């Protein structure tokens, strides 16, 4: 475990004053990582460490660690731990004034803000797991806006099955100045490619980032113009932005060869207004089988017809006029999977690239040719 803090700090006890909004912001950024129902009580706590003119706020679940630094009036340096959820709940209700923290004997902590006073039990700071070692040497850099967009366009495609660990995250790849992010659950796939510029050319890099780390990473993104640095060391990778860092274990295992899944011979291109398809599909899917979510897509010259027909729920049908003059084709698709894709495409028009009822549907758009999503077909 961690080294015990110096005796001089123990005898004087940590004391800090910090702006309530600053404190709340720091706790909010890491409290999602703290374990609330784990077998190690210390993991439900945050580690607060004060030195010089700042305080660090740290959380971990042993797989992911997050730490941020915030300006504070440090009267006495030291460390303390407090229950993450209780601290967050208290800070959220406090007035927007200065918060005064004082550590007492046996790890108790007094919290004062305005007329409000609390006395909270802590745990020994030395029991808190050490923060994972990570490299400060950046392997690549990208804007917050780029990172947020790439996660948004692929996050939904990850597998919810915890036993398929290699699919419980996203693949981050850098090759020839391009950054790629890929997600798949075996029934669908989403891949987005973005240009990183000449500065990122170098050896190919490939990392599997866990789902929880990605979700926590998105919480840190406040300024679209800010820059994230990415580094990796041994089994850990780190995302750094300003005074905040998230360190995560890499997922072990081999990600599927996603390039083989992307169809290259889907010659039937059906262009349709994204919002029109989205709204019609939502309506028809109301009567889709609750397990399979299947909707039948019948495409012919001038129209696309969406149909569901189940004995238990009944039938639904909606026809949409389209400017298509190719050969007819029918395919069964999971309505939720298609809607997930439509929710993240920003273009007004989407393209359904089809071949036949036994082949996957490739969904693209004209304005973003570096984003592709594949939905596997279902038996009609």
Where are these regions (language model features)?
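Structural preference for solvent-exposed beta-strand-turn elements
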Residues: 1-380
